[in-house]
Amino acid sequence: MKALVINYGVGNLYSISSALKRVGFEVTIDNKPRNDYDLIVFPGVGAFSAVAEFILRYRELFNDLRRSGTNFLGVCLGMQIMFEKGTEGKESNGLGWFKGIVDKINANVKLPHIGWDLVFEVKDSCELTYGLDKKYVYYVHSYVAYPTSGDYVYMKSQYGIEYPALVCDKNVVGTQFHPEKSSNTGKIFLENLKGWIKR
């Protein structure tokens, strides 16, 4: 099973690439999306506005790949870029695959939020969430998605406010947490992801 990790030109992609390899993916890192992969990964590095500029160059190709059935995983910022807009840096358009805006955590808490927190299911479980309910996952973020619909929110976490931890719609899945830093829970999720791709 082949995965393409998109290189936005910022950040270290080693962790997510290594985690995918550990569960059996063949991983390529490239800055151009292609249609000959089982999974395309938007990693969790950079700022929303900077990544939005990169995404804009390939927006139609990403949309075409999604419509053709290519599977996508977005991690942290990679999940956030799948929403309509983000305010980090400056207000910028995302891909719009999920309805809602990405904004700073609106609570009197220390930011960035770094560390372990529980995830909990908010909808009937899907293949992606098996074994994850009430388990600890790792976060590094100051911004969260504020969706206009809960239809695609399968898991949440809480840090001052409740926010989406895992979203999914057809062939697109996003996690606010970092599976590559979430120890055994992250490995469980990535194993689930392989099964979800084979569905």
From Swiss-Prot:
What Pfam families does this protein's entry cite? GATase
Where it sits in the cell: the answer is: Cytoplasm
- What keywords does the record list, in alphabetical order? Amino-acid biosynthesis, Cytoplasm, Glutamine amidotransferase, Histidine biosynthesis, Hydrolase, Lyase
**EC number from the UniProt entry:** 4.3.2.10, 3.5.1.2
Per the Swiss-Prot or TrEMBL record, the active site comprises C76 (nucleophile), H178, E180
Where is the Glutamine amidotransferase type-1 domain positioned along the sequence?
A: 2-199
Tagged with keyword Ribonucleoprotein: no
Give TM regions.
none
Q: Which GO terms describe its cellular component?
A: cytoplasm
**InterPro entries according to UniProt:** Class_I_gatase-like, GATASE, Imidazole-glycPsynth_HisH
**Which reaction is this enzyme known to catalyze?**
5-[(5-phospho-1-deoxy-D-ribulos-1-ylimino)methylamino]-1-(5-phospho-beta-D-ribosyl)imidazole-4-carboxamide + L-glutamine = D-erythro-1-(imidazol-4-yl)glycerol 3-phosphate + 5-amino-1-(5-phospho-beta-D-ribosyl)imidazole-4-carboxamide + L-glutamate + H(+); L-glutamine + H2O = L-glutamate + NH4(+)
Which biological processes are named by the entry's GO terms?
L-histidine biosynthetic process
Q: In which pathway is this protein known to take part?
A: Amino-acid biosynthesis; L-histidine biosynthesis; L-histidine from 5-phospho-alpha-D-ribose 1-diphosphate: step 5/9
Give the GO molecular function terms: glutaminase activity; imidazoleglycerol-phosphate synthase activity; lyase activity
Tell me where on the tree of life, at the top rank, the source sits.
Answer: Archaea
Q: How does it assemble?
A: Heterodimer of HisH and HisF.
Q: Which PANTHER family match?
A: IMIDAZOLE GLYCEROL PHOSPHATE SYNTHASE SUBUNIT HISH
Q: What does this protein do?
A: IGPS catalyzes the conversion of PRFAR and glutamine to IGP, AICAR and glutamate. The HisH subunit catalyzes the hydrolysis of glutamine to glutamate and ammonia as part of the synthesis of IGP and AICAR. The resulting ammonia molecule is channeled to the active site of HisF.
Instruction: Return the protein name.
Output: Imidazole glycerol phosphate synthase subunit HisH
> In which organism is this protein found?
Saccharolobus solfataricus (strain ATCC 35092 / DSM 1617 / JCM 11322 / P2) (Sulfolobus solfataricus)
Which gene name does the record give?
Answer: hisH
